[in-house]
Amino acid sequence: SGLLNLAAQIDKNGNTLVLDGGDSLQGTPLVQYYLAHADEFPHHPVAEAFNAMGCDYFTLGNHDFNFGYDALRAYLCAMDGVCLCANVQDLGGALPLLPETVHTLKNGLRIGITGIVTDYVNVWEQPQNLKKLRITEAFDAARAACARLRPICDICVCIYHGGFEEDLHTGAVLSGSGENLACRIARELDFDLLLTGHQHMPVESVRIGGTFAVQPPANAGRYLQVEAAVRDGGAEFSARLLPVGGIHREQPYRRLLPLEQAVQRWLDEPVGHLEQAIPPEEKLCAALHGSAVAALFNQVQLSHTGADISCTSLGNEPAGLAASVTMRA
């Protein structure tokens, strides 16, 4: 619903670009259900929403690889916008993606854009999902794309599905793993604008070196409106984090309604029963005293897999379970 509501707020003109930073195929029951029943529904829900808002360019996030090559191809082919990802090599030859592009606005400004995904995809992703893909080193790909774009554009933009490796207030290094490289990209490469993601951390604006950087929070609850101007001294930027709101247009909502109704029925299907409900657990309380929800999940995983040790990851929001457990929980 966040993407559909966002689409209702966008009023494009010839000097507007709509960009997205990836991780669109994971994290919602709607997409999970759709990917398991794609042959029953003619419209890809995520692509429909992005197309409704006029998404021009986007890059891939690490979670967009979770469902394999064919699911990724179906998503990219359903999108009207162009996928830019300079460090993804398509060995299968069926993905419509480019390393970078130059978009000329109505006012004549040339916007050079590239996309990069954290190369930690190689660490996290199941090997079978990457058989037809090669994810190369993110910084090297960004550097090469910037070098190609810089001489032929007025504003150079990197859509980076990765985050900041430093504390933005103190400069303290938070991680040297290479998962997040936004600060290094901003300092060492000649991008004017760095659109980051991955960390789910709202950053309305920060200047690192000569680069203006931003990051929207997760789940399409808010979006970033960035305004740019080119003057004699170079590109100048301002940005605002804005709420998505609760209004959507009739289409593509009506086209997607049969899928939404099927998802709601699926979410209400019973999966088990507890002797008593587990109330929502605050993060600090769970960290100090343990989590009944995590304990239950781990016991189920141990029982069904025969493993010796089980770990589970809980969501960002405190959650509990009703006595009658459904897919909705």
Regions found by a protein language model. Name each.
Residues 247-253:
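Short, surface-exposed linear segments at secondary-structure transitions and domain or protein termini
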